[in-house]
Every structure is written in structure tokens, then in C-alpha cells.
């Protein structure tokens, strides 16, 4: 069996790859693994279970709840809430485990299972590996040890989760949003109720789009992967800014008053300055990834802020933040982590903090985001090559040195192996788009000839 867990839980086409049987089995396995790790020692264990609104979440939720309860875990079922809400509630309610059913920005037929440990943190790799091992052992015939009588778990609908999470969001804001008009695109997803309520309670005038989930329309032409509707709505309504989430609202992208996109790097730049001014940017450092735009790095250097870059993935950003004690990190895609207030990317919190900075300064989002200038970026995927030689080919190394010499300080080259396919990704940033395209094209040709 190949590894079930990816960088963000277990995902697949619901009822094909991710079946009710798999969801139930993984939940029982997770309960057994956490029990043997001592997480449940000395008390009756509790889990928080939430989901996004896609149709398959209903039967998968039933399977997860059944699995946990059959393993002796009491379940607080919080219903449709964002991933960061489930993480927050897992921590604030003192639960031993959290489970979120979502495939984030993926299309409706997909779904996923993500586990959180006590405190609302993602499970460590070794625990995920152990869950897979235990699941496979029992799938192939070894019986479970099952509680009976009063030992089985009880299931409760925890209806206070919505208000508790919104109150948390409002409570950590540095200032109110009175006077701001904000358009919210909720991707017909998990934040369709939460985000508009939070922005309204914070004082903003709110216009919503993509906030009518029917189980089938999640991420369908809307949300953070499709900004066209948000751009048009912001201009149409004369709003100060627009905020877009994905299906589980763990990410946030923005649009300024003119309908121009403000990406994750720009959001990080705005928040880094806000947190520095408030004395909250620990070690004057922000964490990004190797894909963070060079313009972001240059802007932070001008402001005396250090950028630490990790491998691609919010998991690696979070690991760096926790290990080094940094307060802010994220990705260009809009995963932003404010570690003092969240254990994972939180799109609603990010949007609120961005709007709060606009309200506090009286400056437009375009002006604030202008602290950094995005350098044109070109990405070319070169398939069917020996990706393992990307760092050892002398021919390729020579071509990279020549490209870097041509680009100078206002450009950069990044070659990355795909983690799942036999391809190499060539990324080039330059002062203008034509130069970036030319350099990327030449490097892609060398990759093809040297590694093909």
C-alpha cells in the first residue's frame, strides 16, 4: 500500500479513493495510536469533528464519528466550519484529537481527512505513519480491541463552536473595521457563515458572494482559485477591498479597490510591517518558502526584516516557525500563519488582520501592498527527465550560473524536482517578463537535453 497521508492529510475522490470504510478505519486507527502514545492517559478521550459543505462530507463525517466512538472516544460534532476553526476548537476545548473533512481548494468530487493533535496542531509524520501501519494491520485481518458498555464513545452536537470561534477572531484583532466596505468570496465553502459574521461584528460593511453552499458548488468558479468574480464585485460595489477564501478557508487572497490581486507574499509584507510596528514580529523575521517572490525578499530587506525560506508547503513553514519561535509565516498561495493566534493557516483571521491594517492606517490596500513590487515570474515544467540529477549535472549547473549572472541582483533561478512526477520545475524571476521568459526557456531546454 502506498502512503495514504500526503502533506495535508488523506485526500482522494470521495466514495472511490476515500471511502466510508477507509474513513472509519483511519479514525479507529488514529484513536488506537494516540491511546498507545499516552494521549488519552488518565481521562476519557474527546474529539472535535468538523467538515466543509461538500456533499460527501455528510457520509464521511458519519464514518469518522462512528469510528471514533466505537474506539471509546467521545465526539463533539461541530458541523460545517473552517479547518482553522476545528484546529482552534480542538485546542480551546482541550480535546485530544481533531478531525476535519475537506479537500480544501480541490473540486467537489474530492474530499479529505485531516487529523489534529491535542492543542490543534497537525499530527507529526511519525504518528501519521503509525496510523497507516495500524490501519493496514487491521484491514488485513487483525481484530480491533473494542470497548463495550459504558466504554463506547458518546456523540454530541456542539452548536457553540461557531460563536466561540468568531469571538476568538474578534478578540485578537488590534482594531475595529468601522468605515470599511469589504466584499467576501467564500467559495461556497466552510466559511460561508463564519467570515461574513466576523467581519460584520468587527464593524465592516459586508458584501458577500460565493456564500450559498449547496454541497455541489464548492470552489466552482469562485474563491481564492478564481478571483474574477471578486475583482468585478469589488469594483461594482465601490468596496475598499475584497477577500477570497478556498473551500476550507485555510487560505486568503485579496483584491484592492481597483480590482487588482494582492497575493500571499504581499499580504505577508503588509502584516509583517503591522506586526513589527506593534512589537509582535519576533526576531524581526518572517517565514516564506523557496517560491516566495524575490520582490518580497527585497522589500523585507529594505525594512530590516529577515526572510527565512523553507521548502514549499505550509507544513514546512509552520515547522520552521515553531522550531525558531517566529510569529508570522506563509506562502504565495495565501496560506498565512499567525502563530500567536492560530496553529494553522487561517483565511478569515488573515483577511481580518489585513482589513484592520487598512482601517488603522487610513491607507488603501494598494498603497500598503505597494511596499513590495512583484518581480515577473515564469514557471516551466519539464516532463520525462531524470529529476534525481537536477543537482548533479555539470551542464545544468553551468547554465544556471550563466543565467544568474545575466539576471543579476534583480532576478533569480530555482530548479525543483516534482515530488510525485518525473519532471523538473524551472522558475525564473527577472526585472521584466520577456527576460524571465527567455531565460526560463533556455534553462528548460538545457534540463531537457541534460536530464532527458
From Swiss-Prot:
Keyword annotations from UniProtKB, A to Z: Isomerase, Magnesium, Metal-binding, Phosphoprotein
This protein's GO CC annotations: cytosol
Organism: Streptomyces griseus subsp. griseus (strain JCM 4626 / CBS 651.72 / NBRC 13350 / KCC S-0626 / ISP 5235)
E.C. number(s) listed in UniProt: 5.4.2.10
Catalytic activity, reaction form: alpha-D-glucosamine 1-phosphate = D-glucosamine 6-phosphate
Residues annotated as binding Mg(2+): 104, 246, 248, 250
Name used for this protein in its record: Phosphoglucosamine mutase
Record text on cofactor binding: Binds 1 Mg(2+) ion per subunit.
GO biological process: carbohydrate metabolic process; peptidoglycan biosynthetic process; UDP-N-acetylglucosamine biosynthetic process
Gene name linked to the record: glmM
